[in-house]
Amino acid sequence: MRTTDMADELFRGPETELPAGVRLATAKRGGVTVTRVEIAREGLARPRGRYVTLEMPSVSVLDERDTDVIETGAAELRALLPPEGPVLVLGIGNRRVTADALGPRTAQKLLVTMGPQHTLPVRGIRPVAALAPGVSGDTGLTLRQLAAAMVDAVRPAALICVDSLCSAEAARLGRTIQFSDTGLHPADARHARHLDAAALGVPVIAAGIPTLMDADEGADLVLTPRALDSVIAHGSALLAGILNRALQPRLSVAQLCWLTG
């Protein structure tokens, strides 16, 4: 089987055929299919924890104004987050490589509420900081070193890592969003992007959209969606809209668009 970061691609079929310790449930919300996978034990294809996948029409035709998708995604993401406390968002990836630019592009669109310009607390506004740490070739530091330094500086209640994901199915590229509370654990062992609570001492939520797939098992070749530029542009806007709504539930989608536009 080709490499995949998507938990629902690994565990499918009737409940009686699922491995022991795995639960799967699917529901429709408007035009969005929500699949929840809960892995209750170690030793399976993905780390123990909760995974939520939203499946929809291509994100290349959606953006931060698509209220139904944003409300559905925000509710699912909010359920994985601590109810209060500062949140640090890291946009993982290389902004110069289109298929890997989802994280940095998403971080640019977030409503940041920490820093010198936000010295006075506003009732109901959650403190949020965002950063695109770049790649080790540019910084000379590993992702884990940078993440640990940022966590030490911000002292967040949770860390959200946004990254491009890998799917095993071409039809799902640019059409799904996955959230998980397991941290960042790329299925491809060649990627050194592993961040989790054990390494950083805070809950780590992973969020992403699949933008590539292996062309063949064991080959150094990947496939990307035909409209990749549009997938990254619209997908990052949609994902930022979901994160903003999840982190600032007292602000409407329209208000968040105005504040970040």
Predicted features along the sequence, with ranges:
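A structural signal for small-residue-enriched, beta-sheet-centric alpha/beta enzyme cores
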Residues: 131-132, 145, 161-261
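A glycine- and small-aliphatic-rich helix-loop capping segment at beta-alpha/alpha-beta transitions
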Residues: 72, 76, 98-115, 176-185
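Catalytic-core regions of hydrolytic enzymes
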Residues: 128-159, 164
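Gly/Ser/Thr-rich loops at beta-strand to alpha-helix junctions
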Residues: 92-102, 137, 164-168
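N-terminal amphipathic/basic leader segments beginning at the initiator methionine
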Residues: 1-49
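Short glycine-rich or small-residue beta-strand-to-loop segments that form or flank ligand, phosphate
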Residues: 55-57, 86-97, 130-134
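An N-terminal, well-structured beta->alpha segment
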Residues: 41-81
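Long, charge-dense
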Residues: 105-139
